[in-house]
Design a protein with these regions (language model features):
Chain A
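N-terminal domain-start signal
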Residues: 1-355
Length: 355, 687
């Protein structure tokens, strides 16, 4: 019975997604994008790919940020399409995944609000780059931007999950003039909601999602911890406030212990050694430049995720694994694409874009 | 046409000073599929070395791609390849091309930057619209209300009066800022005005207003009590956005015109790059000694004389050419250097050649299955899709495809022709079955398929039931498999593989058992499933070939010993292996052939489904008829939708199933798809 329902649930969706995987941009396209002479040429390369709409927006407006907005729409459309084909439980889970875009867009809106009301900057044209169509919550983004007082701001967010998060962080935003705690709290909101929704899945699907989301959380925590150590010199207690629970191999107490006991140089090998021994050898490559070290960390973490995704793609074809893999691969593709296009726009050298 | 083209191998030595002329001659004739000399010798001859190209091929290809991409962004939307000629092969200055491309890219970016700036203006205006939209209902708001509400928005709204004579100049100066100005009334020589702009531009706007004799003040209520300021402002902004979008679109057109104006340069440069790319590709296969250049490769034997002539001419007879038969090369290189395969079929068979290549290329020297595929594919398709009307639609769609894809790739054109052929086949079988869009417009030339499925008389005594239709397809399957076996035997005889010819599942022993199986099957059915042929027949038909199969391993062993190969020990394991292999092979022969033959019943299955669907749609249309039994619009619509659905669904199914039967039932009997495609370097080679 369980077998029948999982076939019913995933046969069509996964067959569709497996076909779509052939449209994923290969490494060859990325290399050509990196090697293109300027942004215009890079965009022309996209004309023959599944990202043709992005090129069309650029050809019409000449505006990279408008193309990025199109990419975000394309990315969300993937989830919305699966949402249409899924049953109720799957739809709820897809909504939990879609939450990341709602949060991402809210962060963009709130950064503009912050620029306007706290930093007193002009945001007139920048406000054109936020996504106004509703993702999960229907709220008026312009009302948020226009809200100079806290009460108006909270009123404009009524009905969303953001009200409490904003309310809890408002004092720090105004006094410390930083969005850092708010953004961290929003990330926590996403992961907590996702882990909660996981509980409604079948045992097999839950195991897959917990593993994959757990790996993502591990990677997110590793990135944060390294940044805290290298750039912010946070104390272990400060660090602990921003750690996400639910990691696959790196639990908060282990992270705390490693953060407390390791110096800058030993932290990454120690973190990887505790959870991801198979790639820890990569971390031994010495890099003195702090940014190069971060790039190296990110590429190692990317490699870890790739390995997990590869395992899932070769696994059960009637499970949530294919869908999760597809989302991760596409997300990775889109983010890499955005980085390269921005790199081209700002004339970054090729080696900076390879990372 | 029956077999793959005969190939011949050339090894040539020319003087270094003649190498460019020889390269051009090779490029022009374009028949040589190059093999590096080092591959022949195994790569360990220290006297010869590779020829280093003076220009980087990667750089040539990169620039060529850039041109293709940029040309594709012109008004045509795609890069259209025009084959280069030898005249295009001039000295190449990559620096010049790169410089020109950089100039074009730079100008393109300038245009894009202008578009981007306009986009930002549009965004600002759109922002003003959003801000204005927040000020209550569009019908009730007045200038005063608007002004009062602006304190929380990004907008600044000024109300006051200015001398009427200055209005025109002020409005002109205001155009550089995203803004709206409206005259709300005139009194004597002063105009009452409302100016909406972004807060960040407030300072500059105030300066402009001051310079125009502006007196700040409320708009007199009396002059505009019901004036819908918001509506007017929105309309004005929409208009400005429209103008900006037109400017943006005009810049896009300007960009395309900029690209189109340079098409001639693009085309010339592309041809120059392409011809040089091919020239250096040929030379990359060359090996050299101090004074000579060596090259080698395959060509169809029919071109031997013409290649010889052009090489002698290019090298002014200062060259040495050595020709080898394929067998010599494969033996000498122990199969390292594979003989390429060229299928040579007349143009009308090319769509079927595409189907064969899609599966794989046949082994060199074996039968080219294209003509057989053409016949069987069309017969199967016709039987599954037997309706003249539907066939005619496919013919029309095929011609439409040919027109639409006239500038596209070869495969799209071939697919269109294949659809035309399939349509024609359906037209013929439709006439045989008397079916025209499901209607029996004319009497069937063979039997009435629809009548059989509907349980009526077929108008032909030989075929009266669905079982008769299934039987036709089984006969057809036996014919296809029999042809496959025959082709396999021809291939094996040509290769001199006598062991396989005798003992293989698709060899003589296999065919012998299949023939006996077919006879036994029909005998069994004819005797109402109660009797088998006599014991003598069963012994000859199955017993002897089975015993021969058992003898395969010992015969192989004897031959190996005679051939001086490593001896396999005769032990109990050997006999157990032999026995196991024998049992497995027997099972494969019996179950495999049975499954292969019955697989052809799908031809009848699809045909029955086609007719059944049409009958179902006719019944549905009948149910939608009017009260007096006259046809209604709905019944016509149902018939139209039904026909479209059947053409689309059944057309696709029949096409796929015909392909499947060819690939998995027919090909599995004789086709060895290990061929490597013949791929000569020619100035006429398309991308």
């Amino acid at each position: 019975m369980i077998v029948t329902s999982s076939i019913k649930r995933y046969a069509f969706i996964n067959a569709k997604l497996k076909t779509r995987l052939s449209l994923v941009l290969g490494d060859e396209v990325f290399i050509r994008l990196i090697k293109s002479q300027n942004l215009g040429e890079a965009m022309l390369l996209l004309k023959e790919t599944s990202f043709a709409s992005v090129e069309a927006v650029y050809a019409r407006t000449g505006d990279l940020k408008m193309s990025e907005l199109e990419l975000m729409r394309a990315e969300m459309a993937l989830y919305q399409e699966i949402h249409r084909f899924g049953d109720k439980d799957l739809q709820e889970f897809v909504n939990a995944l879609l939450m990341q875009y709602e949060i991402e867009n809210f962060k963009n809106v709130f950064r503009l609000w912050f620029d306007r009301w706290i930093r007193k900057r002009d945001i007139s044209y920048a406000s054109g780059y936020i996504l106004r169509e509703p993702v999960l919550y229907t709220y008026d983004k312009d009302a948020v931007l226009a809200a100079g007082e806290d009460s108006l701001l909270l009123e404009s967010l009524k009905g969303t999950a953001f009200v409490d998060v904003v309310k809890n962080n408002m004092d720090e935003i105004r006094t410390a003039q930083t969005l850092f705690p708010l953004e961290m709290a929003l990330d926590l909101l996403f992961y907590n909601n996702l882990l909660r929704q996981c509980q409604k899945l079948t045992d097999k699907d839950r195991d897959i999602v917990l593993r994959l989301v757990g790996v993502e959380i591990d990677l997110e925590n590793i990135t944060r911890i390294i940044r805290f150590k290298l750039f912010y010199q946070f104390s272990p207690l400060q660090m602990q406030k921003y750690i996400i629970a639910g990691g696959h191999r790196l639990k908060p107490d282990k992270l705390f212990a490693l953060y407390s006991s390791s110096g800058e140089a030993e932290l990454l090998p120690a973190l990887l050694g505790s959870g991801y021994g198979s790639v820890s050898a990569l971390a031994s490559q010495s890099q003195t430049d702090i940014y190069k070290r971060m790039e190296m960390v990110e590429s190692i973490l990317e490699e870890i995720l790739k390995r997990e995704v590869k395992k899932l793609l070769l696994g059960d074809p009637f499970s949530i694994g294919i869908m999760m893999s597809y989302f991760i691969i596409k997300k990775h593709d889109i983010h890499r694409l955005i980085s390269i296009l921005n790199g081209k726009n700002y004339g970054l050298p090729e080696d900076r874009m390879k990372s | 046409m029956m077999f793959t083209s005969n190939m011949i191998y050339l090894t040539a030595v020319v003087l270094k000073k003649d190498s460019d002329a020889v390269t051009k001659a090779l490029l022009q004739l374009g028949v040589l599929d190059f093999v590096r000399v080092s591959e022949l010798s195994g790569g360990n001859d220290a006297r010869i070395r590779s020829v280093q190209a003076s220009v980087s091929s990667a750089r040539i290809i990169e620039n060529k791609r850039r041109i293709e991409m940029t040309m594709g962004s012109g008004s045509s939307g795609v890069f259209q390849e025009v084959l280069p000629t030898l005249d295009d092969l001039q000295d190449l200055n990559l620096d010049d091309i790169e410089k020109k491309l950089a100039e074009i890219a730079s100008r393109s970016q300038e245009i894009k930057e202008e578009q981007r700036l306009i986009q930002q203006e549009i965004l600002k205006f759109e922002d003003i619209i959003r801000q204005l939209s927040m000020y209550g209902s569009s019908k009730s708001i007045t200038a005063q209300g608007l002004r009062k509400s602006s304190e929380y928005s990004f907008l600044t709204i000024q109300t006051g009066t200015m001398p009427s004579a200055f209005v025109s100049q002020f409005e002109n100066d205001l155009k550089v800022y995203p803004s709206v100005s409206m005259i709300t009334g005139t009194s004597q020589d002063r105009s009452s005005m409302l100016v909406i702009s972004l807060k960040k531009d407030e300072k500059q706007i105030l300066q402009l207003l001051d310079a125009s004799g502006w007196i700040q003040g409320e708009i007199p209520m009396a002059s505009s009590p019901d004036q819908n300021v918001k509506e007017n402002a929105l309309s004005d902004i929409q208009n400005q956005i429209r103008i900006l979008k037109e400017q943006q679109s005009s810049l896009h057109n300007q960009y395309q015109a900029f690209i189109d104006d340079r098409l001639e340069w693009f085309q010339t440069s592309w041809s120059l790059l392409r011809s040089n790319e091919l020239f250096y590709r040929i030379q990359s296969f060359f090996s050299a000694t101090d004074r000579t250049v060596l090259f080698s490769g395959w060509l169809p034997a029919e071109f031997k004389t013409s290649l010889e002539a052009v090489l002698y001419q290019a090298a002014q007879k200062r060259c040495f050419l050595e020709w080898h038969e394929p067998g010599e090369i494969t033996a000498e290189t122990k199969g390292r250097v594979a003989v390429p395969v060229q299928l040579k079929n007349p143009g009308f068979l090319k769509p079927f050649e595409m189907l064969v290549k899609n599966f794989s290329l046949p082994e060199y020297g074996s039968i080219d299955p294209t003509p057989f595929v053409a016949v069987f594919y069309l017969m199967m398709f016709g039987f599954m899709f037997g309706d003249s009307g539907h066939g005619l639609v496919l013919v029309l769609l095929g011609f439409l495809g040919k027109f639409v894809f006239r500038k596209s790739s070869d495969s799209s054109k071939k697919l269109s022709v294949l659809i035309i052929y399939c349509g024609l086949s359906a037209v013929v079988t439709g006439a045989l079955f008397g079916s025209y869009f499901g209607y029996p417009l004319f009497p069937p030339l063979w039997f009435n398929y629809h009548a059989i499925i509907a349980g009526h008389s077929s108008e032909y005594t030989g075929i009266q039931s669905i079982y008769d239709i299934l039987l036709i397809t089984i006969y057809f399957g036996i014919a296809v498999l029999g042809t496959g076996l025959l082709l396999n035997w021809i291939n094996l005889i040509r290769k001199g593989n006598w062991m396989k010819l005798l003992f293989d599942k698709a060899g003589i022993v296999g065919g012998w058992m299949y023939g006996a199986g077919v006879y036994t099957g029909f005998y069994f059915v004819r005797h109402l499933y109660k009797a088998l042929p006599g014991q003598t027949f069963l012994l000859i038909g199955f017993g002897i070939p089975s015993l021969l199969l058992l003898g395969k391993e010992p015969v192989l062993l004897i031959l190996e010993r005679k051939g001086g190969h490593k001896e396999q020990k005769i032990s109990i394991i050997f006999f157990l292996n032999m026995l196991m292999e024998w049992i497995v092979e027997l099972l494969e022969v019996f179950s495999g052939y049975l499954a292969n033959t019955l697989s052809f019943m799908r031809v009848a299955g699809l045909g029955i489904a086609h007719v059944s669907l049409m009958i179902a749609f006719f019944q549905m249309a009948h149910m939608a008829d009017g009260p007096g039994g006259e046809s209604s619009v709905w019944s016509y619509l149902i018939l139209l939708a039904g026909n479209i659905l059947v053409i689309a669904l059944e057309g696709l199914s029949a096409g796929i199933q015909s392909l499947r039967l060819n690939y998995y039932e027919f090909f599995s009997k004789y086709f060895n798809g290990s061929g490597r495609a013949y791929s000569p370097v020619s100035i006429r080679t398309r991308l």
